[in-house]
């Protein structure tokens, strides 16, 4: 799996325009293989066409949380869903809280301007 493919698996959900129910994160985190071996504590899904997300790599250049300079911030707010592991949940029964948001996203890009890491939303 390339970094770009991993980004697609972990963060892209073009089939839904928003999280359909409060159970969305529980289903999607499992379906996208983020509950194998451990519960990924936090993850964001983006409900926009791939072309829209790829285009962020040509938008505002910002510094990533880790200090690298290959992050880019979207010009507009995008439809995203934030999944946060609930305090009571323990592996292998990973449970998540689902939040629908409209926020600008910050992604790290590599090579031919392809998103490879979700850094933050603002």
From Swiss-Prot:
Where does the signal peptide begin and end? none
Which Enzyme Commission number(s) are listed? 4.6.1.18
Q: Where are the stretches annotated Disordered?
A: 1-20
- Active-site residues, as the UniProt record annotates them: 11, 117
Mind telling me how this protein is modified after translation?
Not glycosylated although the sequence N-V-T, a recognition site for carbohydrate attachment, is present.
* Gene3D superfamilies xref list: Ribonuclease A-like domain (3.10.130.10)
Which Pfam families does the record match to this protein?
A: RnaseA
Xref: InterPro entries? RNaseA (IPR001427), RNaseA-like_dom_sf (IPR036816), RNaseA_AS (IPR023411), RNaseA_domain (IPR023412)
- How would you summarize the oligomeric state and partners of this protein? Monomer. Interacts with and forms tight 1:1 complexes with RNH1. Dimerization of two such complexes may occur. Interaction with RNH1 inhibits this protein.
Function comment: Endonuclease that catalyzes the cleavage of RNA on the 3' side of pyrimidine nucleotides. Acts on single-stranded and double-stranded RNA.
Q: What protein does this entry describe?
A: Ribonuclease pancreatic
Annotated organism of origin: Osphranter rufus
